[in-house]
């Protein structure tokens, strides 16, 4: 059984994730991504973008700003609805969401009865001011979601691209929520990244597209990221669980060490957002779609797919992590990341630091450097170097030895099976590229 403590230890030790401001004691709910973490995160983002935008001729990208006028959040309902009712336990000083407590059983932490404060509202949005003077007239918010930047640009994208319904707008960006309890490492944080797509459809086509995107998104995790299918499930929201903007919602949940939790939400937002902005900005025609063939004018319905990028990093680490017992009593920690998202694709390892092997190894390294992020390691025994690469998820290790000088071949070792094959140096690049493209994924091994 994988423990979240194992993942946290690996993440810091190997440079995936660090505590923010650690030298000053750290900042709760905020994390920095190290050399390997940023590569893993960017690789996941790249695969998502290819799958959502490049694979669909009717989906385009957008990068909206973090800061927007406060009217955007008034219209969206966040100013009124994006808050939690909280109570504090007077005995242990812990704070809880009011809907998470059974008052008849007392405090979930210390079991004290009748020690709660009166409920009070807790705003989940971060406020700031824009301009030289702090005043309510220039108060703005750090965005709590990326979706609204898409909705307020609906007309700009429609006019500039000449897209026709159905079409989608995708973006990746940071969002901020003043989380009451930031917990489970990078799963729930105050600063996070979302990968969202808003898909605009005719109301009569909502059900078909809603189902389409559910299946499309589930397949992304299994086929592209290589997540084990047994660790994924759908969970549909009940009526009282729906957000204020949603007509229907279904989550894709992943089985983390702390249980099944949402990794992506697929929502039927109806025409709530576009209608709200049409109403509040006083320009309703900006949010209408005119079908030139049928002559219909209507406000499109919206299907949202919202995936947490930072949560995806945690998911891939948990899913790939394994502690193996090998023959002879040896052990290894291995990250079986899909090669497409692994930080390093190949490690080049000269057997020794002499006799021309480092020079040849550098030449082999240069074969890949334009297309793949590579690692060069000449320190320690070859066995220890293999173990170091296993632990950070490098799928292929290439050893340059004395035979490499004589017959121009190298040894390629597969991370997952530890099997080795001898390959001509001139064929190495095409071999690795084919291996990455044809990799079956963790769930099929």
From Swiss-Prot:
<feature type="binding site">
    <location>
        <begin position="262"/>
        <end position="263"/>
    </location>
    <ligand>
        <name>ATP</name>
    </ligand>
</feature>
<feature type="binding site">
    <location>
        <begin position="177"/>
        <end position="179"/>
    </location>
    <ligand>
        <name>ATP</name>
    </ligand>
</feature>
<comment type="subunit">
    <text>Homodimer.</text>
</comment>
<dbReference type="Pfam" id="PF03129">
    <property type="entry name" value="HGTP_anticodon"/>
</dbReference>
<feature type="binding site">
    <location>
        <begin position="192"/>
        <end position="196"/>
    </location>
    <ligand>
        <name>substrate</name>
    </ligand>
</feature>
<dbReference type="GO" id="GO:0046983">
    <property type="term" value="F:protein dimerization activity"/>
</dbReference>
<feature type="binding site">
    <location>
        <begin position="304"/>
        <end position="308"/>
    </location>
    <ligand>
        <name>substrate</name>
    </ligand>
</feature>
<keyword id="KW-0547">Nucleotide-binding</keyword>
<dbReference type="InterPro" id="IPR006195">
    <property type="entry name" value="aa-tRNA-synth_II"/>
</dbReference>
<feature type="binding site">
    <location>
        <begin position="187"/>
        <end position="192"/>
    </location>
    <ligand>
        <name>ATP</name>
    </ligand>
</feature>
<dbReference type="InterPro" id="IPR002314">
    <property type="entry name" value="aa-tRNA-synt_IIb"/>
</dbReference>
<feature type="binding site">
    <location>
        <position position="97"/>
    </location>
    <ligand>
        <name>substrate</name>
    </ligand>
</feature>
<keyword id="KW-0963">Cytoplasm</keyword>
<keyword id="KW-0067">ATP-binding</keyword>
<dbReference type="InterPro" id="IPR045864">
    <property type="entry name" value="aa-tRNA-synth_II/BPL/LPL"/>
</dbReference>
<dbReference type="GO" id="GO:0006426">
    <property type="term" value="P:glycyl-tRNA aminoacylation"/>
</dbReference>
<feature type="binding site">
    <location>
        <begin position="308"/>
        <end position="311"/>
    </location>
    <ligand>
        <name>ATP</name>
    </ligand>
</feature>
<feature type="binding site">
    <location>
        <position position="145"/>
    </location>
    <ligand>
        <name>substrate</name>
    </ligand>
</feature>
<keyword id="KW-0030">Aminoacyl-tRNA synthetase</keyword>
<dbReference type="GO" id="GO:0005524">
    <property type="term" value="F:ATP binding"/>
</dbReference>
<dbReference type="InterPro" id="IPR027031">
    <property type="entry name" value="Gly-tRNA_synthase/POLG2"/>
</dbReference>
<dbReference type="Pfam" id="PF00587">
    <property type="entry name" value="tRNA-synt_2b"/>
</dbReference>
<keyword id="KW-0436">Ligase</keyword>
<comment type="function">
    <text>Catalyzes the attachment of glycine to tRNA(Gly).</text>
</comment>
<protein>
    <recommendedName>
        <fullName>Glycine--tRNA ligase</fullName>
        <ecNumber>6.1.1.14</ecNumber>
    </recommendedName>
</protein>
<dbReference type="GO" id="GO:0005737">
    <property type="term" value="C:cytoplasm"/>
</dbReference>
<keyword id="KW-0648">Protein biosynthesis</keyword>
<dbReference type="GO" id="GO:0004820">
    <property type="term" value="F:glycine-tRNA ligase activity"/>
</dbReference>
<dbReference type="InterPro" id="IPR036621">
    <property type="entry name" value="Anticodon-bd_dom_sf"/>
</dbReference>
<dbReference type="InterPro" id="IPR002315">
    <property type="entry name" value="tRNA-synt_gly"/>
</dbReference>
<dbReference type="InterPro" id="IPR022961">
    <property type="entry name" value="Gly_tRNA_ligase_bac"/>
</dbReference>
<dbReference type="InterPro" id="IPR033731">
    <property type="entry name" value="GlyRS-like_core"/>
</dbReference>
<comment type="similarity">
    <text>Belongs to the class-II aminoacyl-tRNA synthetase family.</text>
</comment>
<dbReference type="InterPro" id="IPR004154">
    <property type="entry name" value="Anticodon-bd"/>
</dbReference>
């Amino acid at each position: 059984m994988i423990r979240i403590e194992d993942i946290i230890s690996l993440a810091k030790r190997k440079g995936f994730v660090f505590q923010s401001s650690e030298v000053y004691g750290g900042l709760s709910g905020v994390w920095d991504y190290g050399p390997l973490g940023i590569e893993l995160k960017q690789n996941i983002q790249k695969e998502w973008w290819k799958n959502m935008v490049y694979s669909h001729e009717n989906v385009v990208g957008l990068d909206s700003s973090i800061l927007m006028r406060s009217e955007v959040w008034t219209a969206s309902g966040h100013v009124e609805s994006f808050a939690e009712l909280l109570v504090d336990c007077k005995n242990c000083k812990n704070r809880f969401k009011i809907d998470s407590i059974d008052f008849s059983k007392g405090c979930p932490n210390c079991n004290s009865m009748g020690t709660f404060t009166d409920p009070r509202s807790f705003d989940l949005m971060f406020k700031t001011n824009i301009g030289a003077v702090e005043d309510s007239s220039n108060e703005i918010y750090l965005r709590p979601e990326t979706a609204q930047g898409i909705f307020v640009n609906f007309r700009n994208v429609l006019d500039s691209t000449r897209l026709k319904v159905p079409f989608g707008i995708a973006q990746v960006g940071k969002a901020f929520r003043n989380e009451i309890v930031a917990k489970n490492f990078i799963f729930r944080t105050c600063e996070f990244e979302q990968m969202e797509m808003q898909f605009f459809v005719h109301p009569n086509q909502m059900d078909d597209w809603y189902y389409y995107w559910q299946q499309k998104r589930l397949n992304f995790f299994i086929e592209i990221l290589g997540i084990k299918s047994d660790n994924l499930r759908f969970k549909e929201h009940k009526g009282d669980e729906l957000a204020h903007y949603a007509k229907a919602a279904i989550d894709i949940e992943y089985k983390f060490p702390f249980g099944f939790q949402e990794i992506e939400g697929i929502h039927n937002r109806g025409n709530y957002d576009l209608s709200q902005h049409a109403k509040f900005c006083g320009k309703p025609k900006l949010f209408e779609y005119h079908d030139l063939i049928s002559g219909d004018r209507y406000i499109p319905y919206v299907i949202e797919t919202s995936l947490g990028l930072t949560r995806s990093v945690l998911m891939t680490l948990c899913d790939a992590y394994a502690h193996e017992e090998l023959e002879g009593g040896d052990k290894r920690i291995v990250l079986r990341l899909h090669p497409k998202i692994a930080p390093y694709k190949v490690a080049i390892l000269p057997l020794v630091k002499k006799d021309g092997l480092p020079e040849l190894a550098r030449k082999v390294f240069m074969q890949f450097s334009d297309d793949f992020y590579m690692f060069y390691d000449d320190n320690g025994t070859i066995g220890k170097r293999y173990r170091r690469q296993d632990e950070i998820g490098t799928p292929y290790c290439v050893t340059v030895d004395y035979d490499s000088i004589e017959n121009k071949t190298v040894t390629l070792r597969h991370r997952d099976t530890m099997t080795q094959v001898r390959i001509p140096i001139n064929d190495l690049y095409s071999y690795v590229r084919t291996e990455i493209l044809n990799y079956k994924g963790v769930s099929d091994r």
